[in-house]
A protein has these predicted regions:
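Transmembrane beta-strands of outer-membrane beta-barrel proteins
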Residues: 1, 25-29, 77-81, 129-133, ...
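Transmembrane beta-strands of outer-membrane beta-barrel pores
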Residues: 28-32, 71-73, 80-86, 132-138, ...
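Residues that define the transmembrane beta-barrel architecture of outer-membrane proteins
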Residues: 6-10, 59-63, 106-110, 144-150
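Surface-exposed extracellular loop regions of Gram-negative outer-membrane beta-barrel proteins
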Residues: 23-27, 113-134
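C-terminal structural cap/anchor segments
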Residues: 132, 136-169
Length: 169
């Protein structure tokens, strides 16, 4: 899925976490096409490096907004991430995950996450983590205009001895 991702590029963000377990945050990151030594748009035909600026129509942009609720034994969150002009931060690839979408495609991703842990460790009951992402690609053909991914994780703590951890995903 494309909903979550990391970036060390230029950006700005904010978060609000009151003391009641709720949290909301939003951030925007942008990647200038300064590294495009190519003749493709927006670099032009000379193949020269061009600085496209911050938050311009030509810069790659990711805008993510997340809301969540956390308590000591459980948590749930949802994120919406709108990526434009070819922003990419995918970590896996089995062919072209964007199908036949243009390289400068826009996409909208939604991600859902939740976890729960038992009151006591050292039992047969594991903690559980769940996640689901779905992405819609604006310029892909109708047969390849969405993708989705999910995960399920189980984790046992202190089962055989203190501080041991066993996990399956």
């Amino acid at each position: 899925g494309h909903a979550y991702g990391a970036s060390t590029d230029t950006g700005i963000g904010w978060a609000y976490k009151p003391d009641n377990g709720f949290a909301v945050s939003s951030n925007i990151g942008t990647k200038s096409n300064t590294s495009c030594k190519t003749t493709a748009h927006p670099c032009g035909t000379s193949g020269s490096y061009i600085n496209t600026g911050f938050l311009t129509d030509e810069s790659k942009t990711s805008w993510a907004t997340q809301i969540g609720y956390t308590q000591p034994r459980y948590s749930a969150s949802a994120i919406v991430n709108v990526k434009s002009n070819g922003w990419s931060d995918s970590y896996f690839k089995a062919g072209d995950v964007n199908g036949d979408a243009e390289a400068r495609s826009n996409m909208t991703s939604v991600g859902l996450r939740a976890w729960w842990r038992p009151e006591e460790t050292g039992t047969a009951t594991p903690s559980i983590s769940l996640g689901y992402d779905t992405t819609e690609y604006d310029t892909a053909s109708s047969s390849q205009d969405t993708s989705s991914a999910y995960f399920v994780g189980l984790n046992w703590v202190d089962v055989f001895q203190p501080d041991d951890k066993i996990g399956v995903a």
